[in-house]
């Protein structure tokens, strides 16, 4: 089977930084006690100014890695919120559905001169869309031998006036990107295996039910991903995870559940940005590389959960 490689991670956050105290004072959250956020690991988050669009974030995330784009066969453009999968703004005036199909992926292709790239929108996997992109891109590269690269992008900002708290987590606007390739990428990874679970019966649920389903399905998703990779949990050197309440990962990793070393669970961006919609795993993976803690040959498992409800994880092996 054709080897697939991943690297050149990039991300950008909303342009306005706020402390939990500021955002609570401005009524952007349901929780009204800043200390409850801080005790869960959240200190700050980033939101977009009114003039900044999700597409602006996408462009800013791709720019630093644009020089590495070569023979791009496809662009996978993921959005957690369907509203960010269209950049048209005049439908209410025109009533013309063309204004609902002004797709950001097409603009990205044109703006970066990726004229041979096929554009794919991925917009029903919520916060797991970026991990879904790994699987989709790997399958496409293996099925299309004339392609050598796929650009994966996710970009979301909440609409003006939105609550920036979901399932008791503080949210940041942001975008991230990476390149997946048939050739090794310096400082990158080899794609190993992916697993996903969707429970459509929980498509429209509340925060408490989401939390209740988090633990058993997280265990199942991670365990099955490891099994499908032909590995054991002890082979996973690092888990790069979603930025949620720090105590949740202590429960997941406890001896009665996953029985995994909590010191190997990596999410250092949590205090500075909270949960950046689909991008946590990319930000934290880049930070793991920059930390120098990960060594060539080590396995890392990236994990996210999103509304829908969908759980996804992917295992990569660091090439260095």
Name each region found by the language model.
Residues 1-51, 164-224, 305, 314-320:
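Condensing-enzyme catalytic core mediating Claisen C-C bond formation in acyl metabolism
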Residues 5-7, 73-76, 149-151, 237, ...:
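Conserved beta-strand elements of the Class I
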Residues 29-34, 99-113, 145-156, 193, ...:
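Acidic-glycine-rich active-site phosphate/pyrophosphate-binding loop
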Residues 55, 59, 89-102, 115, ...:
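Claisen-condensing/thiolase-fold acyl-transfer catalytic domains that form or cleave C-C bonds
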Residues 58-74, 218-237, 256, 288-293:
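Phosphate/pyrophosphate-binding loops at sites that engage ATP/ADP/AMP, CoA/4′-phosphopantetheine
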Residues 69-95:
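Membrane helical hairpin/interfacial module
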Residues 78-83, 124-128, 154-159, 304-309:
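Acidic, glycine-rich active-site loops and adjacent beta-strand->loop/helix elements
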Residues 132-139, 152-175, 220:
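Active-site glycine-rich loop that binds ribose-phosphate moieties when present
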């Amino acid at each position: 089977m054709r080897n697939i490689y991943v690297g050149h991670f990039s991300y950008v956050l909303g342009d306005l930084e706020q402390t939990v105290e500021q955002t609570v004072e401005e009524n952007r959250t349901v929780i009204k006690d800043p200390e409850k956020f801080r005790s869960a690991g959240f200190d700050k988050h980033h939101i977009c100014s009114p003039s900044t669009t999700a597409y602006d974030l996408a462009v800013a995330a791709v720019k630093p890695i644009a020089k590495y784009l070569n023979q791009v066969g496809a662009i996978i453009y993921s959005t957690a919120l369907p509203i960010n999968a269209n950049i048209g703004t005049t439908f209410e005036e025109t009533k013309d559905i063309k204004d609902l199909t002004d797709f950001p992926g097409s603009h990205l292709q044109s703006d970066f001169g990726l004229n041979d790239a096929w554009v794919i929108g991925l917009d029903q996997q919520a916060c797991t869309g970026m991990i879904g992109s790994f699987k989709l891109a790997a399958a496409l590269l293996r099925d299309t031998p004339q392609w050598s690269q796929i650009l994966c992008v996710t970009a979301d900002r909440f609409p003006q006036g939105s609550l920036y708290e979901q399932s008791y987590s503080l949210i940041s606007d942001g975008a991230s990107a990476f390149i997946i390739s048939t050739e090794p990428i310096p400082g990158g990874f080899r794609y190993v295996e992916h697993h996903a679970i969707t429970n459509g019966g929980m498509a429209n649920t509340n925060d408490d039910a989401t939390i209740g389903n988090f633990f058993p399905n997280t265990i199942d998703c991670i365990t099955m991903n490891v099994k499908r990779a032909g590995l054991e949990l002890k082979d996973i050197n690092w888990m790069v995870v979603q930025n949620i309440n720090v105590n949740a990962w202590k429960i997941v990793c406890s001896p009665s559940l996953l029985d995994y070393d909590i010191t190997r669970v990596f999410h250092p961006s949590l205090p500075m940005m909270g949960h950046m919609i689909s991008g946590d795993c990319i930000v934290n993976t880049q930070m793991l590389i920059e930390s120098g803690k990960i060594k060539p040959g080590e396995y890392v498992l990236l994990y996210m959960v999103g509304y829908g409800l969908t759980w996804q994880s992917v295992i990569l092996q660091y090439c260095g």
